[in-house]
Design a protein with these regions (language model features):
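Active-site-proximal mixed secondary-structure blocks
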Residues: 1-167
Length: 167
């Protein structure tokens, strides 16, 4: 992987998110990844940022809440099976779920990403807030996505680095 400037990126963010991604966070003893598909890229407080949404019961949320840094990794379509698995199996249920994929973790001091990723964003957490029933204008969203009232948490991270797979 090589580091590039964010201004060098040329992609459609909607296409990128359509193919899912993995958010990964760690603590001193472990790391965990989960699939995400809700989010977006933008700017906040004069910083380049990305937003993602995670339900409160997800194991990765516990790690995110205790670490200021995390990564979001994007993959070629050939890794869809791994992303599907990591989105289905919770770290709450299987602490060894990461070893059941063919992904190779690259573990650095504050972060973890994957050797197989085509694009990795490294983030510093800037803002966290839980969505609320009252804040959701279209009530069909609640019926379709939050029958259990497990409203997602919104995470906004400042993009610290961008890594791209070398060809």
């Amino acid at each position: 992987m090589k580091e590039i400037k964010i201004e060098e990126l040329t992609f459609n963010p909607f296409d990128l998110l359509k193919d899912w991604a993995l958010v990964t966070s760690k603590n001193q003893d472990e790391f965990n990844s989960m699939t995400i598909s809700w989010g977006g890229f933008g700017s906040l407080w004069n910083k380049y940022t990305a937003t993602m949404y995670i339900r409160p019961q997800r194991y990765t949320k516990k790690l995110l809440d205790n670490n200021d840094y995390y990564t979001i990794s994007f993959f070629d379509k050939e890794y869809k099976k791994e992303l599907s698995y990591l989105g289905t199996i919770s770290g709450n249920d299987d602490k060894n779920k990461m070893s059941n994929t063919k992904l190779t973790p690259v573990i650095e001091e504050e972060i973890v990403y994957y050797k197989e990723a085509k694009l990795v964003f490294i983030f510093k957490k800037e803002y966290v807030n839980q969505l609320t029933k009252d804040g959701i204008i279209d009530k069909k969203v609640i019926e379709q996505n939050y029958q259990n009232k497990d409203y997602s948490y919104e995470y906004i991270g400042k993009i610290e680095k961008v890594l791209i797979k070398e060809k």
